[in-house]
């Protein structure tokens, strides 16, 4: 505790000494600059009360400085030594504290300088009145103060330089120690770092080895898993392919069954249409036989009734009868040919249906049914057309024979001239049949041949007595 107080007192004394030295230095600086002027005047004997003037104030300040610097040299020296010891002790680890003290000292010096400047300005104002009396004294005192201040400044400078050298040496020693300490620490850090790097290197190698082993193990597991999955996928794919194969075979079988069913249905439909066509042809044939039978009966009856009428005809009538016979034969031949052509067309139509059915067995049942239906309509229509053509030709022939055999009119010259060929102006066809030059039973034979050509037959009525030429005029029916 006591040592701490002594150190505090020493520090305070050192600060006071530095402040006093700074103040004296500032005063000396002002004097050297010549800011203070002196004026010599005559000295009078007037006694005035003594009072301190500018010089007195300066001298008082200098005296205080002298007492502080010289009069208390022992204390100052002791304080200085103590301060030096303290500075030496603190130089190693308290460089920052020294900087703070230096800053504080500079601040104090500045404050003292400001205060001295203020006082100097005040003294300057008062000096104007006191210059005459105190000029010589002031000059002398100034010289003395200058000399003393110079000595003190020199001593202070030497002391400061010495202390600076000592501080420099101590600082160098400390810096050397710090340098050695830093080098040692750097070496230790380097060794520690190398050791740590070795440990890290070994650790990294171990970790890399472990990672490599784990990677190899994972790769092996992944390969095994991939292989298992590939086998499973292959098995599933094979199973699916088998299922799809079975499904495709089943669908192909179903398609073939449906095609066979469609083919059977189409064949059945074609058979039905063929039966229908044959039935229609049979009906047409029966109708033709019936019509020809009727025509035969009508012609025989008419011929018998007209025998008396025909027996009295002239040679012209016989010639016309011959022409009528030839024309009737041609008409019968044409009718038979037309009947054969229609039958051939129906046969070719049935054959075409068979070929169409063979080509379209792969089509759907609905399309086959539609086509069969259309074919049925076409066959029916063609059967009706054939039936109408045959019946129309036979009807026209029957009507012409009936109309002419039952009539009693005598042909005119115009009709006679047109007997060899049709009369275009009247729209009638003249047929001349030569009965005289024809053997007995010729008409019946012609009709029988016509029936045989069309696949029909009828009973022969025998020969017709007194056959002569018959002129038959077939007239076209006008609409």
UniProtKB/Swiss-Prot annotation:
Gene3D superfamilies: 6.10.140.1430. Pfam families: LEA_4. Residues 71-169, 210-237, 310-433 are annotated as: Disordered. Keywords: Coiled coil. One of its GO terms (biological process) is floral organ abscission. GO terms for cellular component: cytosol. Residues 318-356 form a coiled coil. Highly expressed in the epidermal abscission zone cells from flowers and siliques. Expressed in roots, vasculature of cotyledons and leaves, stigmas, anther filaments and pollen grains. The keyword Mitochondrion does not apply. Residues 72-88, 97-169, 313-359, 368-387, 414-426 have a biased composition (Basic and acidic residues). It comes from the Eukaryota. May function in the proximal abscission zone cells to prevent water loss after floral organ shedding. May be involved in the reestablishment of desiccation tolerance in germinated seeds. Belongs to the LEA type 4 family. This is Late embryogenesis abundant protein At3g53040.
